[in-house]
Amino acid sequence: PTPADRLAAMSSTRPVPYGLPEHAPAPITTRVDDVALVFEGGGMRGTYTAALVQVLLEAGLFFPWVGGISAGCTNTVNMVSRDLWRTREAFVGLTTDPQAGGWGSFIRRRGYFNSDHIYRHTSAPGELFPFDWPTFKAAPATVRIGSFRCDTGEEVYWGLEDMDELEDLLPRCQASSSMPVLMPVVHIDGAPYLDGALGSTGGFATDAAAADGYEKMLVVMTRPVGYRKPAEKRPGVYRRLFPSNLLNILSSLNTSDTSPGPR
Protein backbone atom coordinates (compact mmCIF):
# COMPACT_ATOMS: atom_id res chain seq x y z
CA PRO A 1 0.00 0.00 0.00
CA THR A 2 1.03 3.58 -0.64
CA PRO A 3 1.62 6.08 2.21
CA ALA A 4 -1.76 7.60 1.40
CA ASP A 5 -3.42 4.19 1.75
CA ARG A 6 -1.74 3.61 5.11
CA LEU A 7 -2.80 7.06 6.33
CA ALA A 8 -6.38 6.40 5.25
CA ALA A 9 -6.36 3.07 7.07
CA MET A 10 -5.01 4.69 10.22
CA SER A 11 -7.67 7.40 10.08
CA SER A 12 -10.45 4.87 9.62
CA THR A 13 -9.33 2.88 12.64
CA ARG A 14 -8.41 5.79 14.90
CA PRO A 15 -9.74 5.18 18.44
CA VAL A 16 -12.96 6.97 19.34
CA PRO A 17 -14.71 7.49 22.69
CA TYR A 18 -16.98 4.93 24.26
CA GLY A 19 -20.55 5.71 23.26
CA LEU A 20 -19.85 6.29 19.58
CA PRO A 21 -20.85 3.52 17.16
CA GLU A 22 -17.25 3.13 15.98
CA HIS A 23 -15.91 2.45 19.47
CA ALA A 24 -14.57 -1.03 20.17
CA PRO A 25 -12.31 -2.42 22.90
CA ALA A 26 -8.83 -3.35 21.76
CA PRO A 27 -8.92 -7.04 20.79
CA ILE A 28 -7.08 -9.71 22.80
CA THR A 29 -4.65 -11.80 20.77
CA THR A 30 -2.06 -12.91 23.36
CA ARG A 31 -2.67 -13.98 26.96
CA VAL A 32 0.16 -13.68 29.49
CA ASP A 33 -1.36 -16.13 31.92
CA ASP A 34 1.06 -16.10 34.85
CA VAL A 35 2.15 -12.46 35.12
CA ALA A 36 0.60 -9.63 37.13
CA LEU A 37 0.67 -6.15 35.58
CA VAL A 38 1.36 -3.48 38.21
CA PHE A 39 1.19 0.27 37.55
CA GLU A 40 2.99 2.74 39.80
CA GLY A 41 1.36 6.11 40.48
CA GLY A 42 3.10 9.43 40.04
CA GLY A 43 0.58 12.09 39.03
CA MET A 44 1.03 13.34 35.50
CA ARG A 45 4.07 11.09 35.07
CA GLY A 46 1.33 8.56 34.41
CA THR A 47 1.07 10.15 30.96
CA TYR A 48 4.23 8.29 29.96
CA THR A 49 2.76 5.08 31.37
CA ALA A 50 -0.38 5.68 29.32
CA ALA A 51 1.73 5.54 26.16
CA LEU A 52 2.95 2.10 27.23
CA VAL A 53 -0.63 1.02 27.95
CA GLN A 54 -1.49 1.97 24.38
CA VAL A 55 1.37 -0.19 23.11
CA LEU A 56 0.23 -3.15 25.23
CA LEU A 57 -3.33 -2.79 23.97
CA GLU A 58 -2.27 -2.39 20.35
CA ALA A 59 -0.19 -5.56 20.73
CA GLY A 60 -3.30 -7.41 21.90
CA LEU A 61 -1.80 -8.38 25.26
CA PHE A 62 -4.01 -9.56 28.11
CA PHE A 63 -2.85 -9.92 31.72
CA PRO A 64 -4.93 -11.93 34.20
CA TRP A 65 -4.12 -9.52 37.04
CA VAL A 66 -3.94 -5.73 36.73
CA GLY A 67 -3.52 -3.35 39.64
CA GLY A 68 -2.48 0.18 40.40
CA ILE A 69 -2.39 2.99 42.91
CA SER A 70 -3.00 6.72 42.45
CA ALA A 71 -2.40 7.63 38.78
CA GLY A 72 -1.64 3.95 38.33
CA CYS A 73 -5.28 3.15 39.00
CA THR A 74 -6.30 5.30 36.02
CA ASN A 75 -3.98 3.29 33.80
CA THR A 76 -5.31 0.13 35.42
CA VAL A 77 -8.95 0.77 34.59
CA ASN A 78 -8.14 1.91 31.06
CA MET A 79 -6.04 -1.21 30.48
CA VAL A 80 -8.78 -3.50 31.78
CA SER A 81 -11.49 -1.76 29.73
CA ARG A 82 -9.10 -1.95 26.74
CA ASP A 83 -9.90 1.61 25.73
CA LEU A 84 -7.24 3.08 23.45
CA TRP A 85 -8.95 6.46 23.19
CA ARG A 86 -9.46 7.00 26.91
CA THR A 87 -5.97 5.74 27.76
CA ARG A 88 -4.55 8.86 26.13
CA GLU A 89 -7.29 11.38 26.80
CA ALA A 90 -7.58 10.68 30.54
CA PHE A 91 -4.15 12.31 30.88
CA VAL A 92 -3.54 14.49 27.82
CA GLY A 93 -7.12 15.71 27.48
CA LEU A 94 -7.35 16.51 31.18
CA THR A 95 -4.84 19.36 30.77
CA THR A 96 -7.35 21.28 28.64
CA ASP A 97 -10.23 20.96 31.13
CA PRO A 98 -10.67 24.32 32.94
CA GLN A 99 -12.53 22.61 35.79
CA ALA A 100 -9.67 20.21 36.56
CA GLY A 101 -8.20 22.50 39.22
CA GLY A 102 -5.90 25.39 40.02
CA TRP A 103 -5.50 27.83 42.89
CA GLY A 104 -9.10 29.01 42.54
CA SER A 105 -10.27 25.45 43.10
CA PHE A 106 -7.88 25.11 46.05
CA ILE A 107 -9.18 28.30 47.70
CA ARG A 108 -12.75 27.02 47.32
CA ARG A 109 -11.63 23.90 49.23
CA ARG A 110 -12.08 21.61 46.24
CA GLY A 111 -8.37 20.87 46.09
CA TYR A 112 -5.64 22.14 43.81
CA PHE A 113 -6.69 19.20 41.65
CA ASN A 114 -10.48 19.17 41.68
CA SER A 115 -10.76 15.45 42.31
CA ASP A 116 -14.53 15.47 42.68
CA HIS A 117 -14.87 16.83 39.16
CA ILE A 118 -12.01 14.80 37.66
CA TYR A 119 -13.13 11.44 38.99
CA ARG A 120 -16.90 11.74 39.39
CA HIS A 121 -18.03 14.05 36.62
CA THR A 122 -16.02 13.18 33.52
CA SER A 123 -16.56 9.44 33.01
CA ALA A 124 -20.28 8.94 32.38
CA PRO A 125 -21.65 8.65 28.83
CA GLY A 126 -21.65 12.06 27.19
CA GLU A 127 -19.04 13.51 29.55
CA LEU A 128 -15.42 14.39 28.70
CA PHE A 129 -13.85 10.94 29.07
CA PRO A 130 -16.67 8.37 28.92
CA PHE A 131 -15.69 5.06 30.51
CA ASP A 132 -16.57 1.68 29.02
CA TRP A 133 -18.05 0.19 32.18
CA PRO A 134 -19.59 -2.91 30.52
CA THR A 135 -16.22 -4.05 29.12
CA PHE A 136 -14.46 -3.29 32.41
CA LYS A 137 -17.00 -5.15 34.53
CA ALA A 138 -17.02 -8.17 32.22
CA ALA A 139 -13.22 -8.46 32.09
CA PRO A 140 -11.92 -11.95 32.94
CA ALA A 141 -9.15 -10.43 35.05
CA THR A 142 -8.45 -9.76 38.70
CA VAL A 143 -8.38 -6.01 39.31
CA ARG A 144 -6.92 -4.25 42.35
CA ILE A 145 -7.16 -0.53 43.16
CA GLY A 146 -5.32 0.57 46.31
CA SER A 147 -6.00 3.44 48.71
CA PHE A 148 -4.68 4.48 52.13
CA ARG A 149 -7.22 4.33 54.95
CA CYS A 150 -6.41 7.29 57.18
CA ASP A 151 -8.00 6.14 60.43
CA THR A 152 -6.24 2.76 60.54
CA GLY A 153 -3.07 3.37 58.51
CA GLU A 154 -3.70 0.33 56.31
CA GLU A 155 -3.66 -0.06 52.55
CA VAL A 156 -7.06 -1.19 51.27
CA TYR A 157 -7.51 -2.85 47.89
CA TRP A 158 -10.80 -2.99 45.99
CA GLY A 159 -11.62 -5.37 43.16
CA LEU A 160 -14.39 -5.97 40.66
CA GLU A 161 -16.27 -7.84 43.37
CA ASP A 162 -16.61 -4.55 45.29
CA MET A 163 -18.10 -2.62 42.38
CA ASP A 164 -21.51 -3.28 40.88
CA GLU A 165 -21.77 -0.12 38.80
CA LEU A 166 -19.71 2.80 37.53
CA GLU A 167 -20.68 4.89 40.55
CA ASP A 168 -18.86 2.36 42.77
CA LEU A 169 -15.65 2.58 40.74
CA LEU A 170 -15.32 6.35 40.47
CA PRO A 171 -14.98 7.26 44.19
CA ARG A 172 -12.47 4.43 44.65
CA CYS A 173 -10.30 5.82 41.86
CA GLN A 174 -10.69 9.25 43.44
CA ALA A 175 -9.66 7.94 46.86
CA SER A 176 -6.66 6.12 45.43
CA SER A 177 -5.43 9.34 43.81
CA SER A 178 -6.19 12.01 46.43
CA MET A 179 -2.86 13.53 47.45
CA PRO A 180 -2.71 14.98 50.99
CA VAL A 181 -3.15 18.77 51.22
CA LEU A 182 -3.61 19.15 47.46
CA MET A 183 -6.87 17.18 47.43
CA PRO A 184 -9.61 16.56 50.01
CA VAL A 185 -10.03 13.33 51.96
CA VAL A 186 -12.49 10.94 50.28
CA HIS A 187 -14.99 9.01 52.40
CA ILE A 188 -16.20 5.57 51.30
CA ASP A 189 -18.65 3.69 53.50
CA GLY A 190 -17.90 6.23 56.22
CA ALA A 191 -14.12 5.65 56.24
CA PRO A 192 -11.56 8.34 55.25
CA TYR A 193 -9.14 7.60 52.41
CA LEU A 194 -6.21 9.31 50.71
CA ASP A 195 -3.67 8.54 48.00
CA GLY A 196 -2.68 4.89 48.06
CA ALA A 197 0.99 5.84 47.70
CA LEU A 198 0.93 6.67 51.43
CA GLY A 199 0.82 2.94 52.13
CA SER A 200 3.72 0.72 53.08
CA THR A 201 4.76 -0.08 49.50
CA GLY A 202 4.93 3.58 48.50
CA GLY A 203 2.64 3.29 45.51
CA PHE A 204 3.20 -0.23 44.19
CA ALA A 205 0.41 -2.81 44.33
CA THR A 206 2.97 -5.61 44.36
CA ASP A 207 1.79 -6.71 47.80
CA ALA A 208 -1.72 -7.21 46.44
CA ALA A 209 -0.42 -9.22 43.49
CA ALA A 210 1.63 -11.41 45.81
CA ALA A 211 -1.38 -11.90 48.08
CA ASP A 212 -3.32 -13.12 45.05
CA GLY A 213 -0.63 -15.72 44.36
CA TYR A 214 1.48 -14.05 41.67
CA GLU A 215 5.24 -14.49 41.73
CA LYS A 216 5.99 -12.93 38.34
CA MET A 217 5.11 -9.29 37.86
CA LEU A 218 5.56 -6.69 35.15
CA VAL A 219 5.97 -3.51 37.21
CA VAL A 220 5.62 -0.27 35.24
CA MET A 221 7.49 2.44 37.15
CA THR A 222 7.41 6.24 36.88
CA ARG A 223 10.60 6.80 38.91
CA PRO A 224 14.16 5.52 38.33
CA VAL A 225 15.19 2.24 39.91
CA GLY A 226 16.42 2.87 43.46
CA TYR A 227 14.47 6.10 43.97
CA ARG A 228 13.57 6.85 47.58
CA LYS A 229 11.20 9.62 48.59
CA PRO A 230 12.80 11.84 51.26
CA ALA A 231 11.27 12.23 54.70
CA GLU A 232 8.52 14.84 54.97
CA LYS A 233 10.10 18.23 55.81
CA ARG A 234 6.98 20.00 57.07
CA PRO A 235 5.04 17.60 59.28
CA GLY A 236 3.34 20.58 60.94
CA VAL A 237 1.23 21.08 57.82
CA TYR A 238 -0.23 17.61 58.23
CA ARG A 239 -0.65 18.13 61.97
CA ARG A 240 -2.92 21.10 61.29
CA LEU A 241 -4.83 19.51 58.44
CA PHE A 242 -5.18 15.96 59.78
CA PRO A 243 -5.03 16.08 63.58
CA SER A 244 -7.07 12.93 64.16
CA ASN A 245 -5.03 10.89 61.68
CA LEU A 246 -1.61 12.38 62.38
CA LEU A 247 0.27 9.29 63.51
CA ASN A 248 -0.84 7.11 60.61
CA ILE A 249 -0.18 9.71 57.92
CA LEU A 250 3.14 11.01 59.25
CA SER A 251 4.43 7.51 59.91
CA SER A 252 3.57 6.55 56.34
CA LEU A 253 5.13 9.68 54.83
CA ASN A 254 8.38 9.07 56.68
CA THR A 255 8.76 5.33 56.15
CA SER A 256 7.28 4.48 52.74
CA ASP A 257 9.67 2.62 50.46
CA THR A 258 8.92 3.68 46.89
CA SER A 259 10.65 0.77 45.20
CA PRO A 260 8.93 -2.48 44.29
CA GLY A 261 12.07 -4.38 45.22
CA PRO A 262 13.66 -7.11 43.14
CA ARG A 263 11.22 -9.06 40.94
Q: Where are the predicted features?
A:
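Patatin-like phospholipase
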Residues: 1-69, 77-263
